[in-house]
Design a protein with these regions (language model features):
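Hydrophobic, Leu/Ile/Phe/Ala-enriched alpha-helical segments that form helix-helix packing faces
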Residues: 11-14, 107, 111
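Extended interaction regions within the primary functional domain
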Residues: 37-42, 51, 55-59, 111, ...
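A conserved alpha-helical element in kinase catalytic cores
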Residues: 38-77, 81, 85-110
């Protein structure tokens, strides 16, 4: 096992008990745990952008997203979704309207104005670096897209962090 993705230090530091089998995504390893008797999820990230996500998830403070119980640069301890509803399953059963309504409610909650300063995140301009490189290298449609991105960035009136990975499989049921 990659030592940087070992759960042991966090199990000890945050007094966690494993409560299921570990699993992995393209950017993280996750372990269902118990924290002070409650269901929680320990997530250890291997991708830098995921680590910025820890800060953002903490800033959202459980409003439309999982509540963060503890975090550091590499690991995140968050409440675990234990409800039985799956938006993907709802869509498969033909209830896309209801699934989309729930998805939109989650988006509305996480993008609502918050008191206090924004967390320090990757500037949106940096996310467009690859678009600007493609503009220089390939021209064509990339020029139009890069110009549209510049216009939107220059004329933005409010700054709010965007989720960046919200979809039917990533909105969970917290009961």
């Amino acid at each position: 096992m990659n030592e940087s993705l070992d759960f042991s230090p966090y199990l000890e530091r945050w007094a966690l008990q494993p409560d299921g089998e570990p699993f992995a995504t393209h950017s993280s390893r996750l372990l269902p745990v118990r924290h002070r008797g409650a269901a929680a999820m320990l997530k250890i990230s291997s991708a830098e952008e995921e680590r910025f996500g820890h800060v953002l998830l903490n800033w959202w403070d459980g409003q439309g997203a999982a509540r963060v119980l503890a975090y550091d640069h590499q690991a995140l301890l968050m409440e675990r979704a234990t409800g039985g509803r799956s938006l993907l399953e709802m869509v498969r059963r033909g209830d896309d309207d209801e699934a989309t309504r729930i998805l939109c409610q989650a988006i509305e909650r996480i993008h609502a104005p918050r008191p206090g300063p924004l967390p320090e995140l990757t500037p949106l301009e940096r996310w467009f670096d690859s678009l600007y490189a493609a503009e220089r290298r390939y021209g064509g449609l990339y020029v139009d897209c890069a110009n549209a991105a510049r216009y939107l960035l220059e004329t933005a009136r409010e700054q709010r962090p965007l989720h960046g990975d919200i979809h039917h499989g990533n909105v969970l049921d917290f009961g």
